[in-house]
A protein has these predicted regions:
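Intrinsically disordered, low-complexity segments enriched in polar/charged small residues
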Residues: 10-13, 211
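Bacterial N-terminal signal peptides that target proteins for export
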Residues: 1-10
């Protein structure tokens, strides 16, 4: 009888140990709110944390940037798979990669010679890349503070009004974008835009991924199937 009690005691202890292991929080390191709290262009800047499934993501409304994206690998070990800076100052002062994790636009990629004609009107834009206009010009969507419409556990909605004539582009362009995480560990980006006159729009996102985890070496041995 004593042996039976001892056996059940071992089983119970093992079960409790497994339960405790299964309920442990994933080992992730989040950027602090204090490191991203500031003001730019008269608007408040902060950082927002989203969680769903096994994924945790942090976004700042300065440039609508994804600054971290934590997800487990096949062994269950968590890594931050996007590159990002630890403080908002690094983004604002732009002492590194300008478009790191940001929304780019209102026209992503290059416009030859910084000029285009639309409905018979020629528009001239700032030149910022070897004689071309790149990713919206000198002050594109990556260098503005987005207004937060709503923030929940798994979704962040932001908007920005790109004014008529801003960086040379025609039309008041109202842009809304949504970052979402799903229970299936999906990371979604949804854009919408409306304008009050004909214009050119090509919105995009500029993350830098390292599926080994930030700081864990080169990506040259990555294999991607599309």
């Amino acid at each position: 009888m004593r042996k039976s009690k001892a056996l059940w005691g071992c089983v119970l202890a093992a079960a409790l140990l497994l339960a405790a292991c299964g309920s442990q929080e994933p080992k992730i390191t989040l950027f602090s709110n204090e490191a991203f709290q500031t003001e730019a262009d008269g608007k408040p800047v902060g950082i927002y944390t989203l969680r769903a499934g096994d994924v945790t993501m942090q976004v700042t409304n300065y440039g609508a940037r994804v600054v971290s994206l934590w997800t487990p690998d096949r062994a269950g070990d968590y890594e931050d798979i996007v590159l990002g800076y630890e403080t908002i100052d690094r983004y604002i002062n732009n002492d590194g990669e300008r478009f790191l994790g940001a929304v780019v636009g209102p026209y992503a990629n290059r416009i030859a010679k910084g000029s285009f004609t639309l409905d018979g009107t020629e528009y001239n834009l700032p030149i910022n890349n070897n004689g071309q206009t790149l990713h919206g010009g000198i002050d594109g969507l990556d260098r503005v503070v987005w207004d937060v419409v709503s923030a929940s556990e798994d979704q962040l909605v932001m908007k920005y009004l790109h004014a008529d004539g801003q960086e040379g582009f025609p039309g008041n362009l109202q842009i809304e974008m949504t970052y979402s995480l799903t229970p299936e560990n999906e990371f979604r980006i949804d854009y919408s835009a409306t304008t009050d006159k004909p214009t050119v729009v090509n919105l995009s996102h500029h993350p830098f991924f390292n599926l080994k985890g930030e700081g864990n070496g080169t990506i040259l041995d990555h294999v991607m199937t599309i």
